[in-house]
Amino acid sequence: MITPKVLSGFKDRLPKDAIQKAQLLSKVSVVFQSFGFVPIETPHLEYAETLLPDASSDIQKEIYRFKDHGGRDVALRFDLTVPLARFVSLYHQTLGMPFKRYAIGNVFRGERAQKGRYREFTQCDFDFIGSESLVCDAEIIQVVIASLKALDLEDFCVSINHRKILNGICEYFGISQVTGVLRIVDKLEKIGLNGVEEELKKECDLNPNTIKGLLEMVQIKQDDLSHAEFFEKIAYLKDCNENLKKGIQDLEKLYQLLGDLQISQNLYKIDFSIARGLGYYTGIVYETTLNDMKSLGSVCSGGRYDHLTKNFSKEDLQGVGASIGIDRLIVALSGMQLLDERSTQAKVLIACMNEEYFSYANRLAESLRQSGIFSEVYPEAQKIKKPFSYANHKGHEFVAIIGEEEFKSETLSLKNMHSGMQLNCLSFLKALEIIGENDEDL
């Protein structure tokens, strides 16, 4: 006999969990659509050569790669952005530019499993392809904020940086191993300052003074300073080199655009330590954390990638986008008790006291559905205690009872499972009114 078990880092979803996830995905999809983003789908499995060039060395170690039955070198996608580059390169002539897309799907990384981190997880990506305008960058951040608010989250911060600022810092200290250094800097939250310092010594062979100066600069943060105060504080960096100058100027323009959108200044701050480990980012980058749950890591991250299609096409299309980590958000929202705890999406359970009443019960259920009320019929004629227990377990808000009197008069008795109150022999229209209002004082 096979012992039923799930691989480490993977998970099953019971009905309650699956319902919660579906509800969150529905909410963010509505936000994406409200900004004009359209859905696309790409395969879970790609040629390895499609995915590998833009994966950092750390992510390459985490990629699920193997030979398929035809001997082809294939891999499971580790994000939805690299497949997007392949997709746009194939179809850009018919898509029309600029192209705004969103995609929701599972991705795979063989990282260490821990709370809020899985080896298979769902990403919700939204991207703006084919424009260099910082208006696109501002809109992506606007969508990030709107999406989190749609999930009833208010206490979060989008930490923003620019890859040119990081490149400029490396240039200032004469560091040539930019990609390797930034990959290590990106681990600051995970392994701490001492851990980053040790890796820079070991892997990049930097001298202590260079490491000290580098770490001092990448720890520059806006914190409680106003936007104007912070830009005044870092103005001197513009004189160091063109990368720093360009990066800071872009952030100044971005902040002007976000200000014009009247987004609360408490929701976004500059943090020079934000590097984003993926090598394809070229401009503004950002990570979003929940202020009371920073240990979960980023729940939404992204940035600008102006050369993503270079591996697939002579036409080098620009892009900017972000990815919402829905699985981490489920962990957070569960801890904050902001999730629907029901194991059903049906609002009403219809219970029959006699098998003869099922025809009427099914007609009643269909009438409720036609009125927009999700309903199900308990499949057995039982004493009422059993359907009540079933409704309590699954989370139905109402039980409609069909006994002899209700059957003969074509009415129903209605019990509110929250308040325990019951009204007998109601007309369909009266019951519909009560169910629609969800009156707790029934």
Curated annotation (Swiss-Prot):
Belongs to the class-II aminoacyl-tRNA synthetase family. It comes from Helicobacter acinonychis (strain Sheeba). Its EC number is 6.1.1.21. Homodimer. GO terms for biological process: histidyl-tRNA aminoacylation. One of its GO terms (molecular function) is ATP binding. The keyword Hydrolase does not apply. One of its GO terms (cellular component) is cytoplasm. CDD domains: HisRS-like_core, HisRS_anticodon. It is found in: Cytoplasm. It comes from the Bacteria. It catalyses: tRNA(His) + L-histidine + ATP = L-histidyl-tRNA(His) + AMP + diphosphate + H(+). This is Histidine--tRNA ligase. It holds the Pfam family tRNA-synt_His. SUPFAM superfamilies: Class II aaRS ABD-related, Class II aaRS and biotin synthetases. Its main location: cytoplasm. NCBIfam families: hisS (TIGR00442).
